[in-house]
Amino acid sequence: MELDILYRDDELIAINKPAGMLVHRSWLDKAETLFAMQTLRDQINQHVFPIHRLDRPTSGVLLFALNSEMARLMSEQFEQHKVEKEYLAIVRGYIAEKGEIDYPLKVILDKIADKFSQPKAAQQAVTFYQNLAKVEMPYSTGKYATTRYSLVALSPKTGRKHQLRRHMKHLFHPIMGDTKYGDLHQNRRLTEKTGCNRLMLHARLLHFTHPKTLQKITISALLDQQWQMLFNQFGWHFTDFFY
């Protein structure tokens, strides 16, 4: 497959990562054969260096460096929370118009890779959110005759593992399609009614200062077909959120 390249200069390159694709090889997923890092390397015939990650089921802007020095410089920006990130999510229910989630999250240890590690104290985790649109659909997923969803812009100010997914669960507005932190019954009903079967979380935008040129860079990624399908069914207009 060929990846959609969103931005490229002499030292950085960004793609629109498809949902379901791992960023790089992992011994925990030995059966996988398709990875964003290796696919991009083969596509541009040049080695690329990882800077940050997106969860496997998350789509959107994924940035790589084209040399190790740039990878180090950009990684420092991410670690120092100097990179602005914005995600789109579709969540269950009507969420408040906007707010800040300041809820510490425990470090998630892998059962195999971290089997000898000791549990760690919860770390600070902060996410800002804004409700962009709401919809009430004429089908039941529980005790009510209708089902409500919200389109939310999420801006994490820290970078904890699964932060957005865990914070939405904490608010009792889980992200639709989330098989780990979401409502499995609601997920199944959404698939039955709409045909959508992915995590509805998309890394829409990255904004940062280029370490070498000092230019302000903004990179945005369009939504895939399943997102566009839901927008159509929910009566949301694509151009209202991408400009």
Swiss-Prot record:
Domain of life: Bacteria
A Pfam family annotated for this UniProt entry: PseudoU_synth_2
Keywords assigned by UniProt, alphabetized: Isomerase, tRNA processing
InterPro entries hit by this protein: PsdUridine_synth_cat_dom_sf, PsdUridine_synth_RluA-like_CS, PsdUridine_synth_RsuA/RluA, RluA_PseudoU_synthase
Gene Ontology annotations of biological process type: enzyme-directed rRNA pseudouridine synthesis; tRNA processing
Annotated PROSITE patterns: PSI_RLU
Enzyme class of the recorded protein, top EC level: isomerase
Keyword Calcium: no
Active-site residues (renumbered): D55
Record flagged with keyword Hydrolase: no
GO molecular function: RNA binding; tRNA pseudouridine(65) synthase activity
EC number of this enzyme: 5.4.99.26
Annotated catalysed reactions: uridine(65) in tRNA = pseudouridine(65) in tRNA
Similarity section: Belongs to the pseudouridine synthase RluA family.
NCBIfam families (alphabetical): PRK11112.1
Protein's job: Responsible for synthesis of pseudouridine from uracil-65 in transfer RNAs.
Protein name: tRNA pseudouridine synthase C
UniProt lineage: Bacteria, Pseudomonadati, Pseudomonadota, Gammaproteobacteria, Pasteurellales
